[in-house]
């Protein structure tokens, strides 16, 4: 008896546990779904769907979800809202599915199916029959007026542009901007979004691809509000203004079934094949430009598998209840009970009771007002009990839109069903399949890669992060990072074609141009608004004995041997004014004989000092092991900030640097321990007249103005303008995306360095990169006469080179005179 009671108790406990578990499972089931709509008309159709679902709630059984509609104004807005979980699902063109998946982690969970069970469209080029007799092959597409659905649509933009790049002679003008490439190829056209921020990131697109667009309302031209937006809009554009329209194979027949175009015969149009021949509209299987997947329903990948499963079951039931795969759009029973206007701006476009009027705000809050759907019901006989009782049955159709004033709302009108995408296939790559080759192919660049040469491990780390950041946005050419032993090595590798670019100080721009035919093509810009900076001498405020006109016996801190601010300008000043003995043009010996101790990174390297090495030139340097006195970021006292650090903690009396360095490193702007207690007022500028000035007074108290650091590449016989333009293009887009200063652990900034490091690749003071005009892309033209004169004073080889050039010119002049 006791054992029986125990058994009963165990069974009861088990049942309670199972029931409780089921209760908790039900508790965690999602109960609602928010649908993001992309227009006012689509919002109205969605609201009609919510009422239909509420009426037929019993037919959904356990798969029912409370559906609400969230209105946006474009696919991009919906992608943004779903990514931030303000909405749950929307339908997207295959081109937008790529964008949503690649950049916002959205995934496709269901796909539309067309008549016959097909899940693909053919991309076709449509022309008016008998037009364009001069168009015999794809190369003849140049200078034609073209109608595109929108920039980024797979069938209407990506496939045609990709095809013309490979077969139609369309040259890539901008590796990272398809709109510029298309604008240089076609005549005036209409491609909606060609001036949007997304497709015009640096704001220099031509409006050529918006010229045919016809939007009138403010903000309506060349946007989703333009009458020529979408596949149906591109069809209208072809009828009224264009030579060619890129459409889906179903678009023409869909449009000819509408009231607006029902009097136009299908044979008014024909397809343009890739081989130049023409074909009938229905011959799209043999005459198309490529195959693309049908539209998909997407949601956030952050949604659980359980949520996605519920969405699929709910949407599948909607498609079953509210679709008619065999319907005839022209003779649908009860169809006349709907408002079938085609233009949403027509008099009755807002329905019998104006209840989808965007200016009637109450409709946004009262989604279930009965009068709103009065026009969506028809009177039918009750077929269940055989009586003549009249009952209103809703005639809602999920794959029909013309009653709402516009076609293809929520779903394409050519769709007949929805198919579930299995969990393992819920990614944009698997959904797109082979069509993804069109998307990546359109982004190919005639210059495949750009190799950046750096000189330290820290710079290499930053370069790799930069490569990852650029790759995330699919920017081309691909960035490759290469670390070399020194800047001289980088010059040699660039000249030999083993590297492509590097960022050099003005002194290295000189060396690279003189000895290796390198040319500067982009320069950094600091706080002056021009690619230049002031060279300043800085001393401590509590060290009044240090004076610029007499530094004998002092300890000095320099940015590096042969650098402009840290060596060439100050040494030229001292030598030219007779403050130190010149020893001919041997500035290293002059400094070693005059200063007691210094840190001049690179001073004992035979790459930079071909004369006698003086150990005192590195006595203040801080690098350990092989890093000691190296002319790169591995030496802690290298560069402008390194020279300032040498002054702060390394025993220096004076440091030579650019005018922004002190302000960048004091007042808590740097977190490193050596800079924590440093304030602007602790330091002063040394002026050439022996006086001092405040740090901010650099315009009056300086050693001269020098050109900013520059990005260099090959010149001379190896000069390649296509490559240079591709490098300029990549760096321009890179700074647009990553030029900000405010960074965190999860973001990248081109013009910032990690805590503990400074001026990696680019100067931390950089605000932007500026393209150097073509007439300044020689080292001497860029650097200017002041720098060239200073270099001749401090560098024996510079003087010899200049002398040889002058003698050569003199001989040529004499020969000409004799002739």
UniProtKB/Swiss-Prot annotation:
Binding site for hydrogencarbonate 2: 559, 565-566
Disulfide bond entries: 36-78, 46-69, 147-237, 190-213, 273-287, 453-490, 463-481, 557-646, 599-621, 618-629, 687-701
Biased composition (Polar residues): 332-361
Signal peptide: 1-21
Pfam families to which the protein is assigned, alphabetical: Transferrin (PF00405)
Membrane topology summary: Lipid-anchor; GPI-anchor
Annotated compartments: Apicolateral cell membrane; Cell junction, Septate junction
Start and end residues of each stretch annotated as Disordered: 325-361
List of residues binding Fe(3+) 1: 93, 121, 231
Keywords for this protein: Cell junction, Cell membrane, Disulfide bond, Glycoprotein, GPI-anchor, Ion transport, Iron, Iron transport, Lipoprotein, Membrane, Metal-binding, Repeat, Signal, Transport
Lipid modification (GPI-anchor amidated cysteine), residues: 796
Subunit field text: Forms a complex composed of septa junction proteins Nrx-IV/Nrx, Tsf2/MTf, Cont and Nrg during late embryogenesis.
Protein name according to UniProt: Transferrin 2
Organism: Drosophila melanogaster (Fruit fly)
């Amino acid at each position: 008896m006791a054992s029986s009671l125990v058994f009963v108790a165990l069974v009861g406990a088990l049942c309670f546990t199972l029931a409780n578990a089921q209760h908790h499972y039900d508790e965690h089931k999602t109960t609602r779904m928010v649908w993001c709509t992309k227009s006012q008309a689509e919002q109205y159709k969605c609201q009609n769907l919510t009422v239909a679902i509420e009426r037929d709630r019993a037919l959904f059984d356990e798969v029912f979800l409370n559906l609400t509609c969230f209105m946006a104004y474009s696919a991009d807005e919906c992608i943004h809202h779903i990514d931030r979980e303000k909405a749950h699902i929307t339908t997207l063109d295959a081109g937008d599915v790529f964008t949503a998946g690649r950049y916002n982690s959205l995934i496709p969970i269901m796909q539309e199916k067309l008549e016959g069970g097909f899940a693909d469209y053919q991309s076709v080029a449509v022309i008016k029959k008998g037009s364009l007799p001069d168009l015999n092959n794809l190369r003849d597409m140049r200078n034609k007026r073209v109608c595109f659905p929108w920039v980024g649509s797979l069938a209407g933009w990506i496939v045609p542009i990709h095809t013309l790049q490979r077969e139609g002679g369309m040259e890539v003008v901008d590796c990272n901007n398809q709109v510029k490439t298309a604008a240089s190829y076609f005549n005036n056209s209409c491609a909606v979004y060609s001036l949007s921020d997304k497709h015009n990131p640096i704001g220099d697109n031509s409006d050529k691809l918006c010229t045919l667009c016809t939007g009138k309302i403010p903000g309506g031209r060349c946007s989703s509000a333009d009458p020529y937006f979408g596949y149906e809009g591109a069809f209208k554009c072809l009828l009224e203004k264009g030579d060619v329209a890129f459409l889906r194979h179903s678009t023409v027949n869909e449009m000819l079934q509408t009231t607006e175009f029902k009097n136009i015969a299908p044979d008014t149009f024909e397809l343009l094949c890739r081989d130049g021949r023409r074909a009938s509209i229905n011959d799209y299987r043999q005459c198309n430009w490529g195959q693309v997947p049908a539209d998909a329903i997407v949601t956030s990948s952050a949604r659980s598998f359980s949520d996605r499963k519920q969405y699929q079951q709910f949407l599948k039931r909607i498609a079953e209840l509210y679709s008619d795969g065999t319907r005839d759009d022209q003779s649908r029973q009860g169809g006349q009970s709907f408002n079938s206007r085609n233009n949403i701006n027509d008099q009755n476009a807002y329905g019998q009771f104006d209840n989808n009027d965007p200016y009637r705000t109450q409709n946004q809050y009262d989604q279930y007002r009965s009068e709103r759907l009065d026009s969506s019901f028809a009177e039918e006989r009750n077929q269940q009990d055989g009586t003549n009782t009249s009952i209103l049955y809703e005639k809602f159709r999920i794959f029909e839109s013309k009653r709402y004033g516009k076609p293809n709302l929520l779903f394409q009108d050519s769709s007949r069903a929805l198919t579930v995408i299995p969990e393992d296939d819920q990614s944009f790559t698997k959904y797109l399949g082979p069509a993804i080759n069109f998307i990546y192919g359109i982004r190919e660049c005639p210059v495949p890669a750009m190799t950046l040469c750096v000189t330290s491990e820290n710079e290499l780390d930053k370069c790799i992060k930069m490569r990852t950041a650029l790759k995330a946005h699919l920017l081309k050419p691909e960035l490759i990072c290469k670390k070399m032993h020194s800047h001289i090595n980088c010059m040699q590798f660039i000249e030999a074609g083993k590297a492509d670019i590097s960022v050099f100080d003005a002194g290295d721009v000189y060396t690279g141009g003189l000895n290796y035919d390198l040319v500067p093509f982009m320069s950094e810009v600091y706080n002056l608004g021009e690619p230049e900076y002031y060279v300043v001498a800085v001393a401590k405020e509590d060290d009044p004995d240090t004076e610029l006109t007499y530094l004998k016996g002092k300890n000095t801190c320099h940015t590096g041997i042969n650098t402009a601010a840290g060596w060439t300008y100050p040494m030229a000043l001292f030598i030219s004014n007779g403050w130190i003995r010149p020893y001919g043009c041997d500035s290293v010996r002059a400094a070693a004989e005059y200063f007691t101790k210094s840190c001049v990174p690179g001073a004992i390297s035979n790459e930079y000092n071909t004369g006698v090495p003086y150990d005192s030139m590195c006595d203040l340097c801080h690098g350990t092991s092989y890093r000691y006195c190296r002319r790169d970021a591995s030496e802690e006292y290298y560069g402008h900030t390194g020279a300032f650090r040498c002054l702060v903690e390394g025993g220096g009396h004076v440091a030579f640097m650019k005018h922004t360095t002190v302000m960048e490193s004091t007042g808590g702007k740097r977190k490193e321990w050596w800079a924590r207690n440093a304030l602007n007022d602790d330091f002063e500028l040394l002026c050439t007249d022996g006086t001092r000035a405040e740090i901010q007074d650099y315009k009056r108290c300086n050693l001269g103005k020098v050109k900013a650091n520059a990005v260099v590449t090959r010149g001379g016989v190896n000069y390649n303008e296509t490559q240079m333009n591709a490098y300029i293009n990549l760096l321009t887009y890179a700074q647009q995306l990553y030029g900000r200063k405010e960074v965190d652990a999860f973001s990248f900034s081109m013009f910032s360095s990690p805590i503990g490091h400074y001026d990696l690749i680019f100067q931390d003071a950089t605000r932007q990169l500026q393209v150097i005009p073509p007439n300044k892309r020689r080292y001497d033209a860029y650097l200017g006469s002041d720098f060239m004169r200073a270099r001749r004073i401090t560098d024996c080889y510079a003087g010899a080179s200049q002398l040889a050039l002058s003698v050569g010119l003199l001989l040529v002049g004499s020969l000409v005179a004799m002739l």
